[in-house]
Amino acid sequence: MYWWQVGRFIRDADVRREFVPLLYQQFDATPSAQPAFFRLNVDLLPMVRSHTEKILRLKEFRRPVRIIFGDADYTLNSGVARTFHEFLPGSELFLIAGARHFVQLDEPEQVARLILTMPSPGSKQA
């Protein structure tokens, strides 16, 4: 599943050719990575359910937050991004057009700009 996911998470074929082999090498070179990845996928829904009580605490978080998602990410889709945005009052939501799961590889300039212009703690967000 990992091999299929990584290839689909990056929109640009040239970027995929450059980065996917590196991601595969890192995955293969880390013996604990595969069991952890498979365990994560098996445990994901039970883990989310067990932590739902912590969601209410997110509404109290008062630091600057920018939620940056690709609008073409079929896994963590725009609905997930909007839910995070609802949980974090005062957060800013950015859905990057055409970007997939690895939005930082699909649109590095936009993501960098959003990070570099992030409001400082204590400042008012736009």
Language-model region placement:
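Conserved alpha/beta-hydrolase catalytic His-Asp/Glu region
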Residues: 1-60
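Alpha-helical elements of Rossmann-like donor-binding domains used by nucleotide-donor carbohydrate transfer enzymes
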Residues: 4, 22-23, 39-40, 82-83, ...
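Short alpha-helix in the alpha/beta-hydrolase fold that links the catalytic acid
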Residues: 53-55, 63, 77-86
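Short beta-strand/loop motif that positions the catalytic acidic residue
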Residues: 61, 67-69
